[in-house]
Amino acid sequence: MRFVASLIGISLVCVQVFADELDLSLNNDALRLQYVYKVESSGLNLDAGWLHHSDNGDILHAGVHLVDLASGGRDKLEAGLGGRAVYTNGDLSGQSGFALPIGGFLRFTPMAINRLSVAGSLYYAPSILAIGDMDKYQEVTLRVSYNVLREADLYLGVRYARGDYKKDVPDTRFDKGMHVGMSLRF
């Protein structure tokens, strides 16, 4: 737990130096903190995050995505494709492992109601991209956001994050269900 606290402290210091986006979401059992750094004029986004579930364990990730507009019309459709390096520590299963899931995200903002957006992401690592005790990893997120301030959104979402392990232990659902969150852009 000291490692996680140190990681959060370092992340908060980095936010003040390089900040682009800080995302926080939670429900009664889980908390997720994510930082996104947008590399200027390259279309690359670098991100790091931590998901903690009070009973099921932790997920740490670092990722890279190529991001651009996927639409040519008035309505804005932003897409990002890439991957992540993921470390999982399942408290209930006693297992941990690494995975390299590939995937991406879509974010749709209709011009007529441009304060509202719908977003989703999907990441999957089959056994060939799993290392150690991990057999596969999957994460799906959907959310509806409202742009409260120019640089701040509030959202309601649903998330499913699961790690499957090679040994005879139950698969770990790190989070499943609804959450609320906010996204701050600097």
Label each residue range with its predicted role.
Residues 41-46, 69-79, 112-118, 150-154:
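Repeated loop/turn-to-beta-strand initiation elements of outer-membrane beta-barrel proteins
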Residues 24-28, 46-52, 64, 81-87, ...:
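Transmembrane beta-barrel strands of outer-membrane/channel proteins
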